[in-house]
Design a protein with these regions (language model features):
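Charged, low-complexity terminal tails
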Residues: 1-113
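Glycine/charge-rich, flexible interdomain linkers and switch-proximal surface loops
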Residues: 67-69, 80-95, 135, 139-152, ...
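P-loop NTP-binding catalytic core
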Residues: 123, 134-207
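Conserved P-loop NTPase nucleotide-binding/switch module
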Residues: 252-259, 263, 267-307
């Protein structure tokens, strides 16, 4: 996605690209391999140490994972190499925003997005934005977004033409979501839901049962049925107040996007993550994607809003 206030010029002498963004100039050397921040965050610490040593980072073995990423990006900036970052946009009350990829909560790897970029490109909370960023300057806390490449896997012009979620017309469900699969561990519960309580696209459903009755197991079974039989559906599993090990188990069991705020995190994170996840789903619907949100649990979310 291209930002209209960014222009790219080439110099035949230095063979570098000069990018202008809000009066900030950055020299990009095409000979230096670009680094993707999101990919670095997925790499294990041992592999990061190898990359850091290749970048000549001092005392790499003594650094934490977050410190390794920071120093790798710092060395990349010193060599005028491109840094690519992506995350879900959160717009604050003052009009500017942040790209967040780590559990959708504030963190040191957030990318600052200016108010002018948000207005000019029509960005909204919940957009997944990928772009070129720069390292923090003196007395700055966050990376800065220089140029937007993609928004929800669309170009900037395509993103500008998308409708608003509030302007879409709600209709009754007219397409069934089939859950039954050939997996023996899941097929019985999936078939029972298909027969006695069929679910359609656009429908809301609530699972009510006492504690320890197997709601989470049923939720995983439903999630696997959705991903197996409905490849065009984007599945989001939202876990609020769960134990960290249950979140890990869900991520290993389900192919969809798992978003979580565990019980040991502040209640403010519970509400913030829920609201950002809902905005993320709206942006996907605006792009023409069918979205299913499975949340566990409504009780803990209501408790978080009441505290």
């Amino acid at each position: 996605m291209e930002s209209e206030n960014n222009s790219v010029k080439s110099k035949s002498i230095s063979r570098k690209k000069k990018i202008h963004n809000n009066s900030n100039d950055l020299e990009i050397d095409p000979k230096v391999t670009p680094i993707n921040v999101s990919e670095l965050e997925q790499i294990q610490r041992d592999q990061l140490i190898v990359i850091a040593e290749e970048k000549a980072v001092d005392f790499a073995e003594n650094l934490s994972k977050q410190e390794l990423i920071y120093n790798i990006l710092k060395k990349q900036s010193e060599k005028n190499g491109a840094i690519i970052a992506g995350g879900v946009l959160t717009v604050v009350e003052d009009g500017f925003g942040f790209l967040r990829s780590n559990k959708l909560v504030p963190g040191p790897s957030d990318v600052y997005v200016s108010q002018s970029q948000i207005r000019k490109l029509g960005l909204r909370s919940g957009d997944y934005v990928v772009g070129l960023v720069r390292s923090p300057k003196d007395q700055e806390k966050y990376y800065g977004l220089l140029r937007v490449e993609r928004v929800n896997d669309m170009t900037s012009e395509e993103a500008k033409r998308r409708p608003n979620f509030e302007d879409l017309t709600p209709i009754f469900p007219d397409e069934k979501i089939t859950l039954e699969t050939d997996k023996p561990n899941d097929s019985l519960s999936q078939r029972i839901v298909d027969i006695f309580s069929p679910v359609g696209k656009g429908q809301r459903a609530l699972i009510v049962s006492p504690p320890k009755a197997g709601k989470t197991m049923l939720l995983k079974s439903i999630a696997n049925g959705i991903t197996s039989n409905n490849k065009d559906v984007h599945l989001m599993v939202l876990l609020i107040g769960e134990r960290p090990e249950e979140v890990t188990d869900m991520r290993r069991s389900v192919e969809g996007e798992v978003i979580a705020s565990t019980f040991d995190e502040p209640v403010e994170d519970h509400t913030r993550v829920t609201e950002v996840a809902l905005e993320r789903a709206k942006r996907l619907v605006e792009a023409g994607t069918d979205v299913v949100i499975l949340m566990d649990s409504v009780t803990r979310l209501a408790r978080a809003y009441n505290l």
